[in-house]
Amino acid sequence: MLATAQVLLVLDTAVMNVSIGTLVEELDTEVVAIQGVITAYSLVMAALMVTGGKLGDRWGRRRTFTIGMAVYAVGSATTAIAPGVGVLLIGWSVLEGAGAALALPSLVALVAGSYQGRERATAYGVLGAAAGVGVAVGPILGGWVTTSLSWRLVFVGEVVLVLVILAGVRLLSEPPGPARRPELDLVGAVLSAVGLALVVLAALQASAWGWLQPRSSPVTPLGFSLTPFVFAGGVVVLAGFVGWQRRREEAGRDPLVRLAMFTNAPLRAGLLTGLAQNTLLLGLFFTLPLYLQLVLGLDAFRTGVRLLPVSIALLVASLAGASLAGRFGPRTVVRVGLAMIMVAALGVLAVIGPELAGAAFAITMALLGTGMGLVASQLGNVVQSSVDDAARSEAGGLQFTAQNLGAALGTALVGAMVLGSLTATFGARVAADERLEPALRADAAVRISAGVPFADTDTVRDALAAADLSDDEVDALVEDYADAQLVGLRSALLGVAALALAAQAATRRLPRRVDEAPTTEWSPDATSA
């Protein structure tokens, strides 16, 4: 039941991403509006996750999970009947995002309270598998339902599933929590929400606005993109949040986040590795659809089918993760998983081309899924086993906050790699293309230097044909652009492989054995003794 909730809470983001074109047409809006709705969902999740974890300690984990899922169901129902983008924003971005922020931290705390030892490790392996399968299956389900039926049916189905989950959650016992109901730090909640939202917004919009040099930035302070200013604003607010938490602790009042938690080495390692995992996951799932859909021209459903080996391997590896951790230890399993992700990224780099290398691509996808499954199967158990019952929801809030930050960073960093390499390579190809007149090459170089989007070659051809160029010139420019697409994707995949290698550093303080984590449990009482 809890695994079903985990799938549900990650599934519809993938569905929404593959339904953008249909939503634009049916809701009579623009692509930028739907992208704004998707961005807003991420912002709401990031802003409220820490507070959602604290509310789990205050209200009780089962009650908070129930409230979160109920809010999520209302959001799904609102989304299903949305007549326009405004209602879609309220239903999907605000209500579903807030519901997920309440439910997810309590979900992992409920698992921790329901299982012990190896059974807990197995349960978190199942949750990891559920989350990964939701991400990977989403494009298949979304593509099929959107193409054959209606995107609205996905959200109707979510309402039905939530009702089933709510009926089943009554069978769960309330796990142990804090001995005293903690006070809710409202000022801290606002500061953390604003700070995290600004940091995530900067990361998500960096590709559109530009990192430093402005692209489509709404304003250009001092001639720069808005991105660094939004990011710096978020950092300043978060610094204020940290200072406020210290002040409350010194006054003997409950903070939103106990800063002493970050001195817990296994917890810190679990959070950092979770951030790295989602950076890699979202970076790869940003890159792969670009190749399959915009380079090869596959539709959403066929794209999902090509990614199916990821889902299958991820499921198998996640379920096997608990037994592997019992034999080799969580640290070793995570390190092997990260190494497999690195090799898979290099493998995809080697096999992508103008034509799909079907068997080789499927093998690399299976390797990628195996690596992701090994990592995902360990981190929930590491985080929850490093704290005691009183801090589980708080740790869960931090866990999902780290994952949301990683997701935003993955999209931003890999997106910047793709577009930066695409622009540089396309400019170099055009400048060296002797099929083009010198005047055309010079003019194109100026236009390309401002940045080019990643689009399918048919769209590029139509745009060039409308620019009063000859057929030969259009053919040459399209060929140069197609070459630059592959170079851009390969550069990004090389970057992902490098990030996977760097992520090994975050694993240094992960437990070497499954039975090592409980002996390092952190308790809020320990810091106040």
Q: Locations of the language-model features?
A:
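Transmembrane-helix exit segments and adjacent C-terminal regions of multi-pass membrane proteins
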Residues: M1-L2, Q6, V242-R247, P266, ...
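Transmembrane core module of solute transporters
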Residues: M1-M45, M49, S150, L222-V230, ...
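Small-residue-rich transmembrane alpha-helices and their cytosolic helix-loop interfaces
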Residues: Q6, I38, S42, T122-A136, ...
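Interfacial helix-cap and linker-helix signal at transmembrane-aqueous boundaries
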Residues: L23-V24, L55-G56, L141-L149, A203, ...
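Hydrophobic/small/kink-forming positions within alpha-helical transmembrane segments
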Residues: L43-A47, A77, G132, A136, ...
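C-terminal module of multi-pass small-molecule transporters
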Residues: L55, G60-M69, T78, A82-I90, ...
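Helix-loop-helix hairpins in multi-pass membrane proteins, especially solute transporters
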Residues: D57-L196, Q205, P214, L222, ...
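C-terminal membrane-cytosol helix-exit motif in multi-pass small-molecule transporters
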Residues: V159-P178, G195-A208, G233-E249, A503-P511
